[in-house]
From Swiss-Prot:
The modification Phosphoserine is found at S1469. The keyword Amino-acid biosynthesis does not apply. GO terms for cellular component: cell-cell junction; dendrite; dendritic spine; extracellular space; focal adhesion; membrane; perinuclear region of cytoplasm; phagocytic cup. Residues 1391-1439 have a biased composition (Pro residues). Residues 146-167, 313-335, 1385-1475, 1501-1548 are annotated as: Disordered. Expressed in brain (at protein level). Expressed on mononuclear phagocytes and monocyte-derived macrophages in the gastric mucosa (at protein level). Expressed in normal pancreatic tissue but not in pancreatic tumor tissue. Reduced or no expression is observed in some glioblastomas. Residues 760-939 form the GAIN-B domain. Belongs to the G-protein coupled receptor 2 family. LN-TM7 subfamily. Residues 1453-1469 have a biased composition (Polar residues). Residues 31-948, 1002-1008, 1074-1093, 1158-1166 are extracellular. This is Adhesion G protein-coupled receptor B1. The TSP type-1 repeats in the extracellular domain mediate binding to phosphatidylserine. They are also required for bacterial recognition and binding to bacterial outer membrane lipopolysaccharide. It is found in: Cell membrane; Cell projection, Phagocytic cup; Cell junction, Focal adhesion; Cell projection, Dendritic spine.
Length: 1584
């Protein structure tokens, strides 16, 4: 009894799985899949990825469809097995089997063949209703059920009848794993096996042969199912809830079967109580059978119900176990709370009584109707609270005896083992039997079969070939036309052969004509006739046209609509004057007025035939304009004649006449095309000639010679010359002429290859293409590589091939041995050098990044088993997304293809990047190949519109640095003007021009004229940069050798720097006719033809000559008897060092520039050029600007001049608004005066002196300088700025005579008898001279000249530490001599200026050089009157205090040779101002600078302090220094603001002698040698 109750429990294990499978099956029941069966069908269902499902035949095989199928796909036949359960229709089929079931491995769509077909019609027997259920087991990839319409032999249109009886069956399927199947799958499979075996017999064996589950009596092995608890209408198992369908089962073979009607089955027996005491739970279940034909149908009601059991207490003390206690607690609830639950469990609840009483229920019915049984009664514990415990058991049992004897039912013994399979191979049968023990005492006999039979299939029968056999033809399809002639077709499938059997013979499709009826033909209008002429020429008019009706026929309708119609013509208004292109004379042709939108045509020029076309269009503003004319229909007379001759030879060849003169025609065309084409029509004419020549070569009456082949290829190369680029672009507008070119070359390879008598190779290398033809047998073929090793190329571009093609030998195999032995293949490979630039494939974002390669094999192979390998070298840098493309005219562009590719296609090729500069293409077809690349974001423009960023950076940095150098030189030109500066500026201009031309040349490769000009000028400027370096070396050599530099020499410099490069370029252009200048890829000298030596040769010669000059200059510098002038020696050394640094860097720069320009793909050369070019600019600026002392001083002088001009030191205004007139000469003297006291202004002096030395001097000046240098030291001096010499005439007390008079104009300064102020200067030199100054006071003359600084604001302290060295005067070409003299008379005031004396000589002459820069503006000067005119003699203002009267000394009374010191100044720098300074008194100018008094006092105090340190006491005539009146002079405020200079010691302040009364001193001896400090030599500039 316990075993019977537990049996239905495991059924509920399937609930979660069934829910999931049914939901997935409903959502995705039908899905199309590959290899599922024959192609598209009206209704085909493919189930895959499902492990359980159900369908009905009515849903899968609709009545209105003739060919339907249902296919179940096995995920993996090695791991899973398919099982199917079919519930058949209750009535037999009315006809032959219409639904077939079979399994197969795969299906070939091309031949409509099933492979590995095995039929299950014998297993299922759908038309036999004697066995309501049928099962099968399938182990192949697909399990299919297909319904086929019976063939219709007498009807043209198949009729879909009502659904047959076989459409009423239903199917359940299950996919079970062969290893470790799931428990739920085994539960269902075991029940299917139980049902299958139960219904099996000899005529209907069971289709389930074996299972991976261990089934015991129809149940899967394993532990029993867990408890189930009902709750409402939900089926629960282990607390997992689900809908009613979760509890659905398909066990239709259980007892009380309701398989035909559907609904609930009978309740099972109560199961075992869950507890032995204390109250337990018993359950029972029932099964729902869905109604036939209703998929997924369920039953209403509860699947499981339960009741309490074993309510008696457990244990003697009234305590129960935990389970019983739980039941007690549950039973202790109120009766009204348990009412519904007890009713649900199905047993009556006890009567409600006293809450404290325990009432027993009545004794139950005896558990057995015969034999010994049990009776039970129960009671409830009614308590007021849950804490109260009831005493005594809750359940009681007692025995009940019945006198009746229980019947013994018949029982089956165990099944015998399965018998062996009836067949050793193929499908057979096996069975087993069992014995029934007879019943007793009226028991029931044994139920169920005594014998079970099932199919067995051990293995396929070997050794017996099974030929493929066709399935039945499908029904004819509907006629393609409802009337008149139509077509019908039907198909069939082949069951594939096995064991080496033959394939199905015949066609899988048949077609036949069908004719249902004559179609009525309606009347049909014929095409409209052309429109008549318009009634008006413009404006509103009308046109008429008519048509004819054809028909009707066979009852058709008549033509509808009018027979004629009218339309307006000239609806467009008459064109306005601005919408008509005016008459134009363009290209020596008169174009008449033409309205916009029309094309005008005129005859071609006299040397051509045809028409020139020119279209008139409207611009965006609606103004008519002429488009450029097109010469696509113009053919030159020469090309036209050759075209006519070629057509005549072709006509002869077609008639079988031998060809004579064909070679001459080709040779003539080579000569004509060598000079280029005049019109785009010449290109088309040449292509037509070559096409006709190919047809002539194809004829057997003419055999082409090697010369013909070479001329043919040469003509193709001439067509692709760079000069014909514009002609190609114009020809492309008329049609795809590139396609014609590819076809022409392919036909030529075919003809020439097969007309070769021997198996040999042919190579033709020209300037623009390389053609290779191989003829080889298929039997001995090897891999072909292009280009082959050891080939001879004439052009530089083809000597080192960068592109390679590999054709595998598998291409030449036909698959048949006999055919391979007799087959001969011709392989043609063409490498086009520049065809890619002619094709209209470049866009704003894409570029053709390689050469074009065409590969042809004749006869063409069916397919390429080994891909064709092509390696391309990239032509441009900065590109991405390299894509292999091929020429395919049959390919229809799709949405996924790149736009605007035209006949180019990316299909059929696979791109394999090799490195940054190479790409490999693997293609599965033969065609024309190239690489299409995408420009980067910064290069998103047309090809070669901008140079690379590297070139821009290199040229830009170099040009900017050199331009800055030029600007600096121009700004300080007056100070550094010299031959070396002129050479440097020309050198910089040549480099800047070269950089600009390099960048321009990168953008003009397509413009032939501009590119040629850029190449020529680049050649010129490259050479000029080398020549200017040579010019600098030459100038340095002439300087160290002492040659005179005059205008003739300077002209020679210009001729060398600019003339020699111009001569070389002119000769090169004249000899080559500019053909070598510029190529297709760069604007520079062509690497072919030797033109590059026109640059390399002169550049190398310049380098060698420069080295020789450098060696000579170096020897001159290091020799003992070399250069004695230190300044000249320093300049020569600097020039030599500049050449040694700049020249190698210049050579490296231009060498890398040539490599970068000619090989634009190499980023290394561009980077090297950018580095060298930038470094060259920095080095030139460093050598000639930053490290050049002259430039530094000139820049400082320029800055100081600007500051002084801003401060108003030019004397332009005063406090009271009085203007001060300062002449240029006064400014020169003022600049020199300020140089003495101001260290910072020393740069002005240095730059001025350097400029004076470097300035070209007249021969007389050179002689004077040499004579001056040979004289005594006392006669040597220089004037400020550009004053070249100072001549000092001795006084009576000075033992020196007057110097010889020089031819230059001298400015003579005479002293007055009155005592004058002394010379004051700054620097350590005065400290060393203090002792001499003191000792010479008594015997010196009473005269001196005071040189005052312009401003005190610019005075700065002397540097703390300054290197000192003593240099003898006669060793320095620029030495200065200071002549100081004081008067012995102490009574005369030292501040009294000298009386004005007329100059002893004529006016000074201005020098040829530029004057020095204007002095920087000083602080506001004191108010003073304007200087008197030169012809008047008023006394200048006194230098003393405002209260002191000015001294006015009278004229000189003694002889000038005894009483005066005459200082003669040779003013060569003022020669150009002779007329302006004729009446100027130099002494008056020197003493009118009252604003220098402050500085004068400070310097005088310094001299006094130095004299005191040498213990030289001043004379008693010294006067104490008077106090200055505050705020009476403007410089006093500055003095207070800035304080006392740092170099003035404070102990100098109490000195008694006034600095303004310093006595004059004179040199004790004439030949005194003055030790000069280094910086003082530079600062000391003016001597009096």
């Amino acid at each position: 009894m316990r075993g019977q109750a537990a049996a239905p429990g495991p059924v509920w294990i399937l609930a979660p799985l069934l829910l999931l499978l049914l939901l997935l099956g409903r959502r995705a029941r039908a899905a199309a899949g590959a290899d599922a069966g024959p192609g598209p069908e009206p209704c085909a269902t493919l189930v895959q990825g499902k492990f359980f499902g159900y369908f009905s035949a009515a849903a899968v095989f609709p009545a209105n469809a003739s060919r339907c199928s249902w296919t179940l796909r096995n995920p993996d036949p090695r791991r899973y097995t398919l099982y199917m359960k079919v519930a058949k229709a209750p009535v037999p089929c009315s006809g032959p089997g219409r639904v077939r079931t079979y399994q197969f491995d795969s299906f070939l769509e091309s031949t409509r063949t099933y492979l590995g077909v095995e039929s299950f019609d014998e297993v299922l027997r759908l038309c036999d209703p004697s066995a309501p259920l049928a099962f099968l087991q399938a182990s192949k990839q697909f399990l299919q059920m297909r319904r086929q319409q019976p063939p219709q032999h007498d009807g043209l249109r198949p009729r879909a009848g009502p659904p047959g009886p076989t459409d009423d069956f239903s199917v359940e399927y299950l996919v079970v794993g062969n290893r470790n199947p799931s428990r739920a799958a085994c539960q269902m499979l075991c029940r299917w096996l139980d049902a299958c075996l139960a219904g099996s017999r000899s005529s209907h064996p069971c289709g389930i042969m074996q299972t991976p589950c261990a089934c015991l009596g129809g149940e899967a092995g394993g532990p029993a199912a867990g408890p189930l608890a009902p709750r409402g209408d939900v089926c629960l198992r282990d607390a997992v809830a689900g809908g009613p369908e979760n509890c659905l089962t398909s066990l239709t073979q259980d007892r009380g079967g309701h398989g035909a009607t559907g609904g609930w089955k009978l309740w099972s027996l109560w199961g075992e109580c869950t507890r032995d005491c204390g109250g337990g739970l018993q359950t029972r279940t029932r099964t729902c059978l869905p109604a036939p034909g209703v998929e997924g149908g369920g039953c209403e009601g509860v699947l499981e119900e339960g009741r309490q059991c074993n309510r008696e207490a457990c244990g003697p003390a009234g305590r129960t176990s935990s389970r019983s206690q739980s039941l007690r607690s549950t039973d202790a609830r109120r009766r009204e709370e348990l009412g519904d639950e007890l009713q649900q469990f199905g047993f009556p609840a006890p009567q409600t009584g006293d809450p404290a009483a325990e009432e027993w229920s009545p004794w139950s019915v005896c558990s057995s109707t015969c034999g010994e049984g049990w009776q039970t009664r129960t009671r409830f514990c009614v308590s007021s609270s849950y804490s109260t415990q009831c005493s005594g058991p809750l359940r009681e049992q007692r025995l009940c005896n019945n006198s009746a004897v229980c019947p013994v039912h018949g029982a089956w013994d165990e099944w015998s083992p399965w018998s062996l399979c009836s067949s050793t191979c193929g499908r057979g049968f096996r069975d087993r039997t069992r014995t029934c023990r007879p019943p007793q005492f009226g028991g029931n006999p044994c139920e169920g079969p005594e014998k079970q039979t099932k199919f067995c299939n051990i293995a396929l029968c070997p050794g017996r070939a099974v030929d493929g056999n066709w399935n039945e033809w499908s029904s004819w399809s509907a006629c393609s036309a409802s009337c008149s002639q139509g077509r019908q077709q039907r198909t069939r499938e082949c069951n594939g052969p096995s064991y080496g059997g033959a394939e199905c013979q015949g066609h899988w499709v048949e077609t036949r004509d069908c004719f249902l009826q004559q179609c009525p033909v309606d009347g049909k209008w014929q095409a409209w006739a052309s429109w008549g002429s318009c009634s008006v020429t413009c404006g509103a008019g009308s046109q008429r046209r008519e048509r004819v009706c054809s028909g009707p026929f066979f009852g058709g309708a008549a033509c509808q609509g009018p027979q004629d119609e009218y339309r307006q013509c000239g609806t467009q208004r008459c064109p306005e004057p601005h919408e008509i292109c005016d008459e134009d004379n363009f290209g020596a042709v008169i174009w008449k007025e033409t309205p916009a939108g029309e094309v005008a045509a005129v005859r071609c020029p006299r040397n051509a035939t045809g028409l020139i076309l020119r279209r008139c269009e409207l611009d965006e503003e609606g103004i008519a304009y002429w488009e450029p004319p097109t010469y696509i229909r113009c053919v030159s007379i020469d090309y036209r004649n050759i075209q006519m001759m070629t057509r005549e030879h072709l006509a002869k060849a077609q008639r079988g006449l031998p060809g004579e003169g064909v070679s001459e025609v080709i040779q003539t065309l080579v000569e004509i095309s060598q000079d280029g084409t005049s019109y785009s029509g010449d290109l088309l004419s040449t292509i037509d000639v070559l096409r006709n020549m190919t047809e002539i070569f194809r004829r057997a009456y003419y055999s082409p010679t090697p010369g013909d082949v070479q001329n043919f290829v040469q003509i193709l190369s001439n067509l692709l010359a760079e000069e014909n680029r514009d002609k190609w672009e114009e020809a492309q507008l008329a049609g795809p002429n590139a396609k014609e070119l590819f076809r022409l070359v392919e036909d030529f390879v075919d003809v020439i290859g097969f007309r070769m008598k021997d198996l040999r190779d042919a190579y033709q290398v020209t300037d623009n293409l390389v053609l290779s033809i191989h003829k080889l047998p298929a039997s001995g073929a090897t891999d072909i590589s292009f280009p082959m090793k050891g080939w001879r190329a004439t052009g530089d571009w083809a000597k080192v091939p960068e592109d390679r093609v590999t054709v595998s030998k598998s291409v030449f195999s036909t698959g048949l041995t006999e055919a391979d032995e007799a087959s001969v293949f011709v392989v043609g490979t063409v490498l086009y050098r520049n065809l890619g630039s002619f094709l209209a494939l470049q866009r704003n974002t894409t570029v053709l990044n390689s050469k074009v390669i065409s590969v042809t094999v004749k006869p063409p192979p069916r397919s390429l088993r080994t891909p064709l390998e092509i390696e391309f070298a990239h032509m441009y840098n900065g590109t991405t997304n390299q894509t292999c493309i091929l020429w395919d005219e049959t390919d229809v562009p799709s949405s996924s293809a790149p736009p605007q590719l035209g006949p180019w296609s990316w299909r059929g090729c696979r791109t394999v990047p090799l490195d940054a500069l190479r790409t490999r293409c693997l293609c599965d077809r033969l065609s024309t190949f190239a690489i299409l690349a995408q420009l980067s974001a910064d290069a998103n423009m047309e090809k070669a519109t901008l140079p690379s960023v590297t070139l821009i950076v290199g040229c830009g940095v170099s040009s900017l640095t050199l331009l800055m150098l030029v600007i600096i030189y121009v700004s300080v030109w007056r100070y550094i003007r010299s031959e070396r500066s002129v050479i440097l500026i020309n050198f910089c201009l040549s480099i800047i021009s070269s950089n600009a031309l390099i960048l321009i040349g990168q953008t003009q490769t397509r413009n032939k004229v501009v590119c040629t000009l850029v190449a020529a000028f680049l050649h010129f400027f490259f050479l000029s940069s080398f020549c200017w370096v040579l010019t600098e070396a030459w100038q340095s050599y002439m300087a160290v050798t002492g040659h005179l530099r005059n205008r003739l020499i300077r002209k020679r410099f210009l001729c060398l720097g600019w003339g020699l490069p111009a001569l070389v370029v002119a000769i090169s252009v004249g000899f080559t006719k500019a053909k070598g200048y510029s190529t297709m890829n760069y604007c520079w000298l062509s690497l072919e033809g030797g033109l590059l030596y026109a640059f390399v040769g002169p550049a190398a010669a310049v380098v060698l000559v420069n080295m020789v000059i450098g060696i000579l200059v170096f020897n001159k510098l290091v020799s003992k008897d070399g250069i004695t002038d230190k300044k000249l020696k320093e300049r020569a050394g600097a020039s030599l060092w500049s050449s040694c640094v700049v020249l190698p860097l210049l050579a490296l720069t231009w060498m890398s520039a040539v490599l970068a320009v000619t090989d634009r793909r190499s980023a290394l050369f561009q980077i090297l050029f950018a580095v060298f070019d930038s470094l060259e600019g920095f080095v030139i600026v460093m050598v000639h600007c930053i490290l050049r002392r002259e430039v530094q001083d000139a820049v400082k002088c320029r800055v100081v001049d600007r500051q002084e001009e801003g401060n108003g030191d030019s004397g332009g205004s005063f406090q009271n608004g009085h203007a001060q007139l300062m002449t240029d000469f006064e400014k020169d003297v003022d600049l020199a005066c300020r140089s003495v006291l101001n260290k910072d202004i020393a740069a002005c002096r240095t730059a001025t002196i350097t400029g004076t030395l470097k300035r070209p001097s007249l021969p007389e000046e050179e002689k004077l300088k040499l004579a001056h240098a040979k004289g005594p030291p006392t006669n040597f001096n220089s004037l400020p700025a550009n004053v070249s010499k100072l001549h000092l005439h001795g006084s009576p007390r000075y033992p020196g005579g007057p110097l010889p008079d020089f031819p230059n104009h001298s400015l003579t300064l005479k002293r007055d008898k009155a005592p004058k102020s002394s010379f004051v200067g700054d620097g350590d030199i005065f400290k060393k001279l203090d002792s001499e100054l003191s000792r010479a006071q008594e015997k010196a003359l009473d005269t001196s000249y005071v040189i005052l600084p312009t401003a005190t604001a610019t005075l700065r302290p002397k540097p703390k530490e300054e290197p000192k060295y003593s240099i003898h005067i006669d060793q320095m070409p620029q030495t200065r001599l200071i002549h100081l003299s004081t008067a012995p008379e102490a009574s005369l005031p030292a501040r009294s200026p000298p009386s004005r004396q007329p100059p002893s000589g004529g006016p000074p002459e201005a020098p040829p050089a530029q004057p020095p820069p204007p002095p920087p503006p000083p602080p506001p000067p004191p108010q003073q009157p304007l200087p008197p005119p030169p012809n008047l003699e008023p006394a200048p203002p006194s230098l003393g205090d405002p209260g002191e009267p000015a001294a006015h000394p009278g004229p000189s009374t003694g002889p000038s040779t005894k009483n005066e010191n005459v200082a003669t100044l040779s003013v060569s720098s003022l020669e150009r101002r002779k007329s302006r300074y004729a009446e100027l008194d130099f002494e008056k100018i020197m003493h009118t600078r009252k604003r220098h008094q402050d500085m004068f006092q400070d310097l005088n105090r310094k001299l006094q302090h130095a004299a005191e340190k040498d213990k030289e006491v001043l004379g008693p005539d010294s006067k104490p220094e008077k106090q200055q009146t505050p705020n009476k002079r403007p410089w006093e405020s500055l003095r207070k603001a800035h304080g006392t200079p740092t170099w003035v010691k404070k102990e100098l302040e109490p000195l008694q002698p006034s600095p303004l009364e310093l006595r004059s001193v004179e040199w004790e001896r004439s030949g005194a040698t003055i030790p000069l400090v280094g910086q003082d030599i530079i600062d000391l500039q003016t001597e009096v």
